[in-house]
């Protein structure tokens, strides 16, 4: 009869430890995939470049000659490239420009497609609408009492900015590396609806504690880019307000510039990026002092910091982008008789505009009856929807689309093309500066948009949002 040996104590102990180690490894694998999976599912790349003018290019945004005589800080253009786990790519550009005209952005889009294979729907070129930044191309051309020498400086600067933008996009794409995307929302209150509150009354109203009136959007959407090791690499944030605190001759980024400077100082190595979320009828009030500009920048930075202190919502994998132009009709295209009358206007801007358009008619040109308006929809995971809209959209658009599409919706104005104010139906019916007969200031061959502007934009946005629905795939 064969003798059966008893199990060795040390052998049993060794097997027990081996089992425990295996169980521990399994548990750890279950605990850490949030960062590991995020690193596998998203890649992000960053790049930035200084855009502070080195020549006498006038500052943009007000109808006068403003030659810069120094700076409070440099102004920037920044790029965030994204790539999901299926290879889909997109690039968001933020900048401290007042306005990027179509004549400039189209050059960027064409070169980007040729060099990097990015389609029009994959790139969004936003500008903060900062009024202490340089002129670009033919943006607001009739606004300024310009000269041939100034035109040459602007053309040369614009050419350099096209080259810098394309190069920066390439750098961001080259820097794509594993990342985790998260988001949250903050709040700050310095934006005031300028249509419903007289600027001169604001200080007394604030001191008395009386409520200001009119629609506002005081939310501060925030998205972070974190690397696989937990290092914060970028903070993208938005706010709906004109960067018009200052109107002097020093280069700076106004309140968004101060907010970005503060965030990057607080978080060394981090890239802070700002988008203007439909601030067409919103002003930082009171204003016109550097101290107030610094204060508003600090308030915005604090709102972002408060978000960073809280648990953020992870953005799941998946990237889908859509884009189209929607033709926005003018109410009435100007005639030769209209322009001849306007050459006698008391407005210097209108006189310059009328004279320029009369030359076009003399050369045999006919004016279009509508303008191609750019609209984007980007879906990041199932959590975040970014709607990009051209030019100076009023706050009604942000409030409407966030209500219709729910939490996680960003509505960015000032994208791709500085066309004019884009009124909602409410603002169009009320008239006034943002909704009335002021398209001539932007060089358009008309005084006013048609009454169905909001309806046309809304229909396009809803169509594009359906196209980027990840759940439909």
Positions of PLM-derived features:
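N-terminal secretory signal peptides that target proteins for export/translocation
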Residues: 1-17
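Bacterial N-terminal signal peptides
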Residues: 18-32
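Sec/Tat signal peptide C-region and signal peptidase I cleavage site
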Residues: 32-38
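Conserved beta-alpha junction segments in alpha/beta enzyme cores
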Residues: 39-126, 130-271, 277-278, 288-298, ...
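Catalytic histidine-centered segment of alpha/beta-hydrolase-like enzymes
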Residues: 282
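Charged, flexible cofactor/metal-binding loops and thiol motifs
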Residues: 301
């Amino acid at each position: 009869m064969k003798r059966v040996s008893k199990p060795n104590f040390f052998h049993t102990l060794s097997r027990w430890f081996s089992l425990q180690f295996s169980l521990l490894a399994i548990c750890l694998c279950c605990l850490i995939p949030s960062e590991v999976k995020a690193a596998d599912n998203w890649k992000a790349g960053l790049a930035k470049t200084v855009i502070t003018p080195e020549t006498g290019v006038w500052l943009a945004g007000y109808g006068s000659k403003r030659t810069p005589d120094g700076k409070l800080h440099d102004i920037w253009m920044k790029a965030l490239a994204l790539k999901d786990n299926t290879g889909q790519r997109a690039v968001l550009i933020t900048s401290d420009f007042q306005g990027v005209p179509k004549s400039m952005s189209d050059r960027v889009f064409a070169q980007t497609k040729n060099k990097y294979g990015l389609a029009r729907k994959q790139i969004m070129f936003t500008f903060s609408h900062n009024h202490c930044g340089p002129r670009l191309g033919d943006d607001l051309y009739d606004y300024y009492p310009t000269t041939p020498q100034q035109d040459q400086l602007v053309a040369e600067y614009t050419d350099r900015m096209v080259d810098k933008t394309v190069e920066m996009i390439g750098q961001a794409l080259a820097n794509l590396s594993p990342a985790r995307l998260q988001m949250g929302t903050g709040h700050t209150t310095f934006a005031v609806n300028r249509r419903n509150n007289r600027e001169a009354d604001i200080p007394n109203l604030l001191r008395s504690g009386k409520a200001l009136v009119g629609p506002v959007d005081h939310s501060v959407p925030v998205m972070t880019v974190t690397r696989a090791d937990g290092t914060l690499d970028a903070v993208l944030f938005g706010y709906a307000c004109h960067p018009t605190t200052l109107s002097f001759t020093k280069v700076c980024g106004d309140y968004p510039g101060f907010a970005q400077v503060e965030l990057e100082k607080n978080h060394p190595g981090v890239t802070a990026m700002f988008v203007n979320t439909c601030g067409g009828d919103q002003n930082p009030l009171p204003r016109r002092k550097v101290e107030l500009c610094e204060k508003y920048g600090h308030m915005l930075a604090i709102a972002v910091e408060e978000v960073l202190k809280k648990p953020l919502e992870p953005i799941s994998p998946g990237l889908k982008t859509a884009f189209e132009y929607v033709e926005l009709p003018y109410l009435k295209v100007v005639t030769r008789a209209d322009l001849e009358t306007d050459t006698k206007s008391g407005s210097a801007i209108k006189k310059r505009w009328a004279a320029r358009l009369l030359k076009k008619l003399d050369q045999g040109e006919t004016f279009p009856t509508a303008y191609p308006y750019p609209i984007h929809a980007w879906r990041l995971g199932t959590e975040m929807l970014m709607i990009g809209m051209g030019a100076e959209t009023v706050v009604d658009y942000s409030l409407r689309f966030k209500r219709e599409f729910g939490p996680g919706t960003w509505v960015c104005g000032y994208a791709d093309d500085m066309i004019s104010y884009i009124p909602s139906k409410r603002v169009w019916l009320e008239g006034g500066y943002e909704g009335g007969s002021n398209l001539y200031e932007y060089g358009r061959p008309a005084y006013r948009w048609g009454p169905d502007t909001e309806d046309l934009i809304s229909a396009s946005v809803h169509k594009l949002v359906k196209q980027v629905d990840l759940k439909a795939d």
